[in-house]
Amino acid sequence: MLWFKNLMVYRLSREISLRAEEMEKQLASMAFTPCGSQDMAKMGWVPPMGSHSDALTHVANGQIVICARKEEKILPSPVIKQALEAKIAKLEAEQARKLKKTEKDSLKDEVLHSLLPRAFSRFSQTMMWIDTVNGLIMVDCASAKKAEDTLALLRKSLGSLPVVPLSMENPIELTLTEWVRSGSAAQGFQLLDEAELKSLLEDGGVIRAKKQDLTSEEITNHIEAGKVVTKLALDWQQRIQFVMCDDGSLKRLKFCDELRDQNEDIDREDFALRFDADFILMTGELAALIQNLIEGLGGEAQR
């Protein structure tokens, strides 16, 4: 099981049918296929269990996991520039005149098409967890852009996907700032030794503290000077450590060894059974963490 490293969390804004049996057919229409000779990028669904299963969905306890794969052709700018300049120089010499901008733009397209079949490919995979019990969708990535791209693929596959980023009633950065100021986080959470503070003023500066006592006078002075905490490293019940961000995302998830080893009694040769057990364990823990976070941050914004 690929234990999630990050969480971009989204709320389903209205009820829709999300059943694995239906989704299996819907995702199949957008299954991943490699780039053709003239494709810059392709994205589609692959089995979350990799070569161990052909299924595009895996479901347990009302939780569904799916996996998107993306192939991108790598064409470094210097390579394009060099090929384009050579082509322009050749034509200008042959025609004894300077080419117009529109002609150069057209040549650039030709150069791209000629280079694409020889370009290297970069592959990436993004796991998505759908919590049908709590009406949440979690994407395992660190950037909103990547999460939105994956959600867009799911939306295209299903025909509709009404989701909004999970948001709190109170600004997250103000709650995090109060936790650091008081030296005490919400019940179940403990401050660790890392934070990022930003000034509310434009061009007011950013402070990144690592391996530092966040209750120290130095940090307090930054807060008194008007900075707010935009990222804060936290421990949840000595089970999961993570960095809480002011956009509602959770970064650098780290599950304790006791948790990760909980299913060690299952034979690793039985990949499907271990994957299922780890998935149930991980989603159960993260669902509880997210619920605790929502409560600790003052509750979810009313829709």
Swiss-Prot record:
GO terms for cellular component: bacterial nucleoid; cytoplasm. The keyword Cytoplasm applies. InterPro entries: RdgC. It comes from the Bacteria. Pfam families: RdgC (PF04381). Keywords: Cytoplasm, DNA recombination. It is found in: Cytoplasm, Nucleoid. Belongs to the RdgC family. This is Recombination-associated protein RdgC. It comes from Shigella sonnei (strain Ss046).
